[in-house]
Design a protein with these regions (language model features):
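Residue-level recognition of single "structural anchor" positions
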Residues: 1-217
Length: 217
């Protein structure tokens, strides 16, 4: 998949790609380049679509060794009692290979029967899996993994016993998404994959090189 059927000049496309990597909003990029905001927004969407496509192509990669699992919630207005989840929020499940990449998936809920198929499909048997004490991870105790739990009420990190990596990703993703001041729910998976890409592919220079290749600009 690449960016095609775009009426913008190639030099404008390249500048938009550079601005995207630098986290310049589409509106600001449009102002700088003297183009219509809708044109910049549409091009940014095309970048996200290409990015999501290529990340999906890579999603068959199996994580092994030490892996961290966690779930988080994005958007919406928190209602009711505080705790796991909230009305109007989007649930996201994350799997991080410690020292490596993160994989994310929007999920309808965070029940064990929803998460376990994702876990067994993505993580190699005999891997060491770190989670918090959420009950949905209880099934890992009788799985083909070595399961270690983190009790946040008593400690945050102790040596290798932590899930700081995946929690760092959540913080980074929410920082990136906060500047958009609201994202349509149907578009959220594309923005999530943008965050996954930024986390997995190093410096802006590296990201630009990869996106030039993926988009064929």
């Amino acid at each position: 998949m690449k960016i095609s059927h775009c009426r913008l000049l190639k030099k404008i496309q390249l500048r938009l790609l550079e601005f995207f990597v630098l986290e310049v909003t589409a509106r600001s990029a449009a102002d700088i380049l003297g183009i219509q905001p809708n044109s910049a927004a549409l091009f940014y969407r095309k970048i996200r679509e290409v990015t999501a496509y290529h990340l999906e192509q890579e999603s068959h990669e199996i994580f092994d060794g030490v892996v961290e699992l966690d779930e988080s919630y994005f958007g919406g207005v928190r209602k009711g009692k505080p705790g796991r989840g909230a009305a109007g929020k989007v649930a996201v499940f994350g799997i991080l290979k410690r020292g490596g990449k993160v994989y994310t998936k929007v999920v309808g809920d965070t029940k064990s029967e929803t998460l376990m198929p994702l876990i067994t499909r993505k993580i190699a048997p005999d891997s060491i899996v770190y989670t918090d004490c959420y009950r949905s991870y209880n099934a890992l105790d009788v799985s083909h993994f070595y399961h270690e739990r983190i009790n946040h009420s008593t400690l945050f990190a102790q040596g290798k016993n932590h899930i700081n990596g995946i929690e760092n990703f959540w913080n980074q993703a929410k920082r990136v998404l906060r500047k958009y001041n609201g994202i349509l729910k149907e578009s959220f998976p594309l923005f999530l994959k943008e965050c996954e890409f930024r986390f997995n592919y190093g410096t802006p220079k590296q990201q630009l090189k990869i996106l030039k290749n993926w988009t064929q600009i």
